[in-house]
Amino acid sequence: IGAASLAVDNELASAPDSPAVLVERDAILSSVNFDTTELALTFEAAGLALSHLAATSAARIMKLMSPASSDLPRFLTRHGGTHAGFATSQKTAAALEAEIRHLALPLGAMTLPVADGVEDYAPMTPAIVEKTRAIALRMTRLAAIELVVAAQAVD
């Protein structure tokens, strides 16, 4: 998150013009400030890191509900038998983890020439930032499930 924050700060502090026309210096300078690869890569890394966090969170949820792993009642219900307890939350956690894992697949390496071949590289930064936002949203939901399950386990 810190690396992504720094990349955003760097991007906001730079001018994306190429070439940069500096009237006060009577100069025209070529620049690479139009290239947002650093920003794209830091958000890709954040998404991948969150996918690892999601996998461990989902695994903890499953283990807390398994008597073999936790010495707690199955699905955290004292009633046993046909009582589902928190079993349905496993399905939601598994679905969220799968969505996060899918969204974390790198997008930035999949680019095509744009602007009729004038611009040969587009790092897909807006799409990467958006998918990282979607990952973070799902991660908050998964964390909420883990907290509820952990609270029930303590209870």
PLM feature spans:
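C-terminal catalytic subdomain
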Residues: 37-155
